[in-house]
Amino acid sequence: MTDTRRRVKVYTLNEDRQWDDRGTGHVSSAYVERLKGMSLLVRAESDGSLLLESKINPNTAYQKQQDTLIVWSEAENYDLALSFQEKAGCDEIWEKICQVQGKDPSVDITQELIDESEEERFDDMSSPGLELPPCELSRLEEVAELVASSLPSPLRREKLALALENEGYIRKLLELFRVCEDLENREGLHHLYDIIKGIFLLNRTALFEVMFSEECIMDVIGCLEFDPSLPQPRRHREFLTTTARFKEVIPISDPELRQKIHQTYRVQYIQDMVLPTPSVFEENMLSTLHSFIFFNKVEIVGMLQDDEKFLTELFAQLTDEATDDDKRHELVNFLKEFCAFSQTLQPQNRDAFFKTLSNMGILQALEVILGMDDVQVRGAATDIFSYLVEYNPSMVREFVMQESQQNDDDILLINLIIEHMICDTDPELGGAVQLMGLLRTLVDPENMLATANKTEKTEFLSFFYKHCMHVLSAPLLANTTEEKPSKDDFQTCQLLALIVELLTFCVEHHTYHIKNYIINKDILRRVLVLTASQHAFLALCALRFMRKIIGLKDEFYNRYIMRNFLFEPVVKAFLNNGSRYNLINSAIIEMFEYVRVEDVKSLTAHIIENYWKGLEDVDYVQTFKGLKLRYEQQRERQDNPKLDSMRSILRNHRFRRDARTLEDEEEMWFNTDEEDLEDGEAVVPPSDKMKNDEDLMDPISKFMERKKLKDSEEKEVLTGKASLSGRQSPSFKLSFSSSPKASLSSPPTASLHPGSPGSPSSPGTGARSSPPSAAVTTKGGLVGLVDYPDDDEEDEDEEDADSKEESPPLSKKSKLSS
């Protein structure tokens, strides 16, 4: 059956004792072969999928609440509820359940699980029912003892609840309460407190509906004022009738809605303020009370949401300039509470709720309210705005982009939020922290949508950097015009720290937008002024900002840092910190350590060439000496490019065995005379020997030795002492690697390709021709390398690329070292 009578929502109780909406569908009961019994089936109204398939277990306790709810537990921690649109549908399904369990449909609970001994169970079942004493003043103590003794036993609780319900006993007890209060009978009032508290712990919806009715609820609260453990009674009724007043900011025409609002407020008050905090053993006994409040709130939000006249009047008065301040304050507080109630809704219902508010113009109303002078009204408006941003940031972004086409930057909604953040009068900036969190959510690309037609990220970030970023950074720019912050009081520093944190977030998550802004506005220089602040937390914020930029390893940022000497304030802060071992000291050292470990060559050279004198005496960490060593290695490679050349040759012969290399070697084989091979002349052994030397000797120490022996080796080579052995072939070239000036047979183009195997010569070395020779000489630990024209021509570009991986081009290095 698919009519509205059987239309239901399926709820499950989560770990936080909150009801989760599992969907809307139509319920039916049928025999399910797989489950071997009659079962409840709920099929989704959207696609017909099965939302619920639950066998009606003869031993499961089902409860009917508020005429339209059926609640039960399928496992120890798995509670289910069906919320019916109509009472008739609930009654039909309840009859089916009672029919399976053999119960009278007039009961509101079929049974409860029994965990007592067989003897107690037999005694309880053998008794026909629980007989209550007459409701008289002299028998109150007896009633209180009966209630207390029934609570531990599920069956006795069931019988007590039925007796209380059938005999109208609660109303009689409340009449006795009025008599006791008139007579000031304190003993009787104490007994009534225990009785009413015990009735709450029975956890029965039918009893709650009697107790929370309009004529009974205040007397129930009165009974709970007289706690025997307190010397004086509480004054809850006085608070509810005189202090807590119901303000009907917009007239509510529906009397049922008005009564539901009153009831929910009072029941919530009973739960939060009147009832004592439940013990561990009593906590689950009030689950029905939690459910009662929850479903009341859902019902209130639904009824208000459906009343278009009410919401239209609400937003009209909110935005009307003629509305006085007190009235507007009440309207905003109502809207805030309305949004708070919506948090009880499930995601799909909440989505419809906020869509309704959006269609009514809630964002336009907030824009008007945030422009007002009343601090309390603005605070409430901020809370409403936070509900909207946290639930649907895309809706807010779409609104502000549309309004930017019509309004000036000063009155844009986001700019109003930024101004309130900047102007927060709270010394601890509580409101500013909240607003900064909302801004972060709005500019976070992770929650931005991308569709086929447009990309929200691109559009919104372009809008934000064009219309809003200058407002956000204004306090930072105004306070950093000198070498030290203009204002260094705590509140200003707190605000600047929030702004820098958001900018750091932008550096991490945005790309070219923030890069262009930082470089064009010189933002990093301004932020680093804050390292001179007396407040360490602000200095650390500035260091985090720079560290995030360096961590990107972006050469645009690196050139910007070097061009403007932006390590200077960092080094100055490090030296001013002295020998103190604190967060600033660690943060700065970590920044330099990152440059060293990641081998950021341009920054390494910049730091050593400009700030080494100030850092060379720091020896309690090896970071700066390590940076110096990195720098010297770079210079060494620039002065001795043969190191890169040798590494690329080694890498080529040891690791690269692709098809092209094999073809080259075959070509070489067929180009070699048989006589060469007969003489036992090895084609590649020199590289093997060089391999062993490279493995045994560190390249740095090897070149240091060469440097010391430079003069003597030059003389030996130049005077022709180097012996040449083996037969020469026109197809071979000879190349020495003794010193930068000892390249005897490099081709004229060798200086253009310092990384090619046949030309390990340094820039500026004149390449002199000599008769081609196939011999290799090793003298003073130096190795001559044999290579071939075929390899040279084909692999020249590839090996040049390999050498570039080791270090930047020489022209770039020479610029850095100059």
Curated annotation (Swiss-Prot):
Cysteine-cysteine disulfides: none
Record field: compositional bias (Low complexity): 729-775
WH1 domain residues: 1-100
GO biological process, one term: DNA damage response
Compositionally biased tracts (Basic and acidic residues): 703-718
Transmembrane segments: none
Quaternary structure note: Serine/threonine-protein phosphatase 4 (PP4) occurs in different assemblies of the catalytic and one or more regulatory subunits.
Protein name: Serine/threonine-protein phosphatase 4 regulatory subunit 3
